């Protein structure tokens, strides 16, 4: 089975840390999002992955589809809950 590799950058950190993830191309992208969020210690439920152009990626597809459509350079954005205590 073929693998795809993503470079995921954490945009909320001024140092712009990144992780390189290699997954089988049939992996659901929701799993990639969850794993990337765990690696950066941000909540997966309130995070989104976007392209460098700022285009949001629908996680309801395979990692292979995302790679073909958007390439390997992605960003993760943790969405903070404003006003919650």
Swiss-Prot record:
Ubiquitin-like modifier which can be covalently attached via an isopeptide bond to lysine residues of substrate proteins as a monomer or a lysine-linked polymer. The so-called ufmylation, requires the UFM1-activating E1 enzyme UBA5, the UFM1-conjugating E2 enzyme UFC1, and the UFM1-ligase E3 enzyme UFL1. Ufmylation is involved in various processes, such as ribosome recycling, response to DNA damage, transcription or reticulophagy (also called ER-phagy) induced in response to endoplasmic reticulum stress. There is a cross-link at residue 83 (Glycyl lysine isopeptide (Gly-Lys) (interchain with K-? in acceptor proteins)). This is Ubiquitin-fold modifier 1. Interacts with UBA5. Interacts with UFC1. Transmembrane segments: none annotated. Gene3D superfamilies: Phosphatidylinositol 3-kinase Catalytic Subunit, Chain A, domain 1 (3.10.20.90). GO terms for biological process: protein K69-linked ufmylation; protein ufmylation; response to endoplasmic reticulum stress; reticulophagy. There is a cross-link at residue 69 (Glycyl lysine isopeptide (Lys-Gly) (interchain with G-Cter in UFM1)). GO terms for cellular component: cytoplasm; nucleus. The keyword Cell wall biogenesis/degradation does not apply. Belongs to the UFM1 family. The keyword Transmembrane helix does not apply. It is found in: Nucleus; Cytoplasm. Pfam families: Ufm1. UFM1 precursor is cleaved by UFSP1, promoting its maturation: processing of the C-terminal Ser-Cys dipeptide is required to expose its C-terminal conserved Gly residue. Residues 84-85 form a propeptide. The gene is UFM1. Keywords: Cytoplasm, Isopeptide bond, Nucleus, Ubl conjugation, Ubl conjugation pathway.
